[in-house]
């Protein structure tokens, strides 16, 4: 804050990178929990810390990373080119280790690139952060999928350490009949397609999105920008119970998104061609409130029909676990299970961190320093 106040923007970026190699990205999308705890709140309002990060990034220009420590001769493979993997690669490279990032998609960034819409995070600004990370000497191998193009066993033979930071990039299912119908897509896949410029024309269509998190808000607002005639959010609890940021909810409402709250998905309606026509939802009521969050139960009323041409499911994310289980890596309830250090009991030199080990979290990068540890 003091450095920005003095106009020393490049120094501010250097300071931020000591703990977080994505200062520009955070200036756009960080959930700024630090502002909620800012002591200035005792006087009037918090300091706009996220905004100051963005000011520093906007005015600093290109700031080179610090010089790396002398080489240790150690080689580290990092599986996953998202924020966790790139953060680990950055700090490990600065320590003198040679890191190689394996990424299955064409470009680095993970959910930052393929999950967050461009209106929230311009991809050229994300590239500013990634470019600085790669300047440290991090090597990259794109288009390789673990278990298909290369195995954990092969990587263990080639590298001193293997770090798994694959994130949580697959979707959870509703568990309803006809969920495989045409016109139904997960929010993760929908946003990934948009991120890869595989644009879906939604002109004149009715779109329903199930879920109340930030991914849900990204999906509905993206659908609106793709020309949808009507976009609705279907959520089983209250607006107050949504995990999305208040600003994202307000933005969606301001753009004409309809909020269908206290409605739980019950069944999916399809036509003779097995294309989604709509969804039946069961009205809910609050049965109790604990720690500010409502528990719900059916009201006993008849199900309500919500017509839609496209149904987007945004109820959470999982990780791809099949190959890792085959490699002897413990997996439980959609997470890779590690010791507190990120290591495994019977796999020396193999570690895991980020969303795949802790469970899906916000991409405001609060966890990224853990990946380097």
Predicted stretch roles:
Residues 2-65, 142, 152-192, 362:
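Glycine/serine-rich phosphate-binding loop and adjoining beta1-alpha1 elements at the start
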Residues 3-6, 11-19, 42, 46-50, ...:
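Beta1-alpha1 glycine-rich phosphate/pyrophosphate-binding loop at the start
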Residues 21, 82-83, 107, 213-215, ...:
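Residue-level detector of alpha-helix initiation sites
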Residues 182-205, 289-360:
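FAD-site-proximal beta/loop scaffold in flavoenzymes
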């Amino acid at each position: 804050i003091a450095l920005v106040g003095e106009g020393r923007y490049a120094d501010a970026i250097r300071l931020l990178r000591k703990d977080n190699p994505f200062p520009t990205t955070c200036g756009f999308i960080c959930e700024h929990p630090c502002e909620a705890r800012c002591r200035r709140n005792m006087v009037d309002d918090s300091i706009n810390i996220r905004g100051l990060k963005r000011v520093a990034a906007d005015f600093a220009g290109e700031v080179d990373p610090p010089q790396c420590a002398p080489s240790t001769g150690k080689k580290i493979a990092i599986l996953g080119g998202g924020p966790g993997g790139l953060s680990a690669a950055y700090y490990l490279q600065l320590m003198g280790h040679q890191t190689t990032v394996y990424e299955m998609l064409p470009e680095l960034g993970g959910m930052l690139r393929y999950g967050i819409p461009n209106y929230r995070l311009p991809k050229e600004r994300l590239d500013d952060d990634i470019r600085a990370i790669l300047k440290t000497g991090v090597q990259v191998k794109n288009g390789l999928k673990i278990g298909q193009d290369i195995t954990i066993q092969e990587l263990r033979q080639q590298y001193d350490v293997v770090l798994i930071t694959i994130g949580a990039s697959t979707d959870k299912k509703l568990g309803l009949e006809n969920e495989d119908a045409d016109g139904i897509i997960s929010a993760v896949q929908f946003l990934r397609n948009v991120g890869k410029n595989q644009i879906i024309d939604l002109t004149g269509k009715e779109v329903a999105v199930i879920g109340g998190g930030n991914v849900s808000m990204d999906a509905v607002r993206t659908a609106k920008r793709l020309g949808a005639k009507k976009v609705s959010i279907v959520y089983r609890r209250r607006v107050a119970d949504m995990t999305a940021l208040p600003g994202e909810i307000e933005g969606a409402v301001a753009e004409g998104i309809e909020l269908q709250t206290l409605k739980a998905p019950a069944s999916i309606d399809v036509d003779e061609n097995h294309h989604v026509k709509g969804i039946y939802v069961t009205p809910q009521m609050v049965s109790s409130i604990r720690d500010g969050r409502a528990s719900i139960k059916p009201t006993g009323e008849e199900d309500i029909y919500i017509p839609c041409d496209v149904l987007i499911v945004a109820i959470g994310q999982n990780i791809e676990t099949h190959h890792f289980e085959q490699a002897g890596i413990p997996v439980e309830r959609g997470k890779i299970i590690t010791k507190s250090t990120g290591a495994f009991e019977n796999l020396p030199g193999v570690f895991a961190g980020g969303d795949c080990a802790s469970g899906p979290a916000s991409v405001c990068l609060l966890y990224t320093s853990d990946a380097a540890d």
